[in-house]
């Protein structure tokens, strides 16, 4: 196991986040399109990769491919160009690589024509990681882009959503952390957001989204993210 720092710096200000909370806690990053939310998530990933820590990134739009330019990270996808072509039957192998092989993995879903196939892959991989962590208890972070697609505020969660809720509620005891990312906090299940140990808010403009911030953090915070 590599030597792990107590904190990492994720912004220029700087803002520090405790590594232990990142790896085994629950976090949420939000902001309108172009506000920097995915960049913040990338910086978090880069800082953890810098010290040799593995993670799983659920990449819905192929945004994290650039991490390969600087780090040893396994890019998995359904189409050519990936390091490893995968489907749901590879779930146990991927979980083993991540936890036992200490391999950081990008689960790139951007090539799926049928989104249900991508959802099945996510579900099975995370389920395998959750199962294996019952014995291993190894600090490990799962980063999920567009988490509102799996944990919507309205409508059924589906199998993957229920699994993510389980990770959020019970993952810490197994060493599992979860970081959700969305440009629409109003569209994300508030039961998840309110359970988060850390929150990163970038600029938001839509009233429903700023209302969520006001409810959680107060009027001053809601005003500041509109500026």
Predicted feature descriptions by range:
Residues 1-75, 130, 161, 201:
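Glycine-rich phosphate-binding loop of nucleotide-binding enzymes
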Residues 25, 103-105, 138:
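Envelope-exposed proteins and targeting segments
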């Amino acid at each position: 196991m590599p030597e792990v720092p107590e904190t990492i710096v994720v912004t220029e200000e700087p803002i520090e986040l405790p590594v232990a909370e990142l790896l085994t806690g629950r976090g949420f990053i939000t902001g309108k399109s172009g506000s920097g939310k995915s960049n913040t998530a990338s910086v978090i990933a880069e800082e953890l990769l810098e010290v040799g820590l593995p993670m799983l990134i659920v990449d819905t739009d192929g945004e994290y491919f650039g991490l390969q330019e600087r780090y040893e990270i396994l890019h998995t996808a359904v189409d050519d160009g990936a390091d490893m072509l995968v489907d749901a039957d590879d779930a146990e192998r991927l979980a083993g690589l991540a936890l036992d092989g200490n391999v950081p993995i990008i689960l790139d879903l951007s090539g799926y024509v049928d989104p249900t196939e991508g959802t099945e892959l996510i579900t099975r991989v995370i389920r395998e990681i959750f199962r294996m962590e019952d014995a291993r208890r190894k600090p490990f972070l799962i980063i999920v882009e567009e988490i509102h697609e799996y944990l919507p505020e309205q409508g059924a969660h589906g199998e993957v959503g229920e699994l993510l809720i389980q990770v959020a509620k019970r993952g810490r005891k197994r060493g599992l952390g979860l970081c959700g990312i969305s440009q629409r906090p109003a569209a994300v299940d508030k039961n998840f957001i309110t359970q988060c140990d850390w929150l990163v808010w970038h600029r938001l403009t839509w009233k429903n989204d700023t209302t969520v911030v006001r409810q959680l953090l107060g009027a001053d915070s809601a005003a500041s993210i509109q500026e």
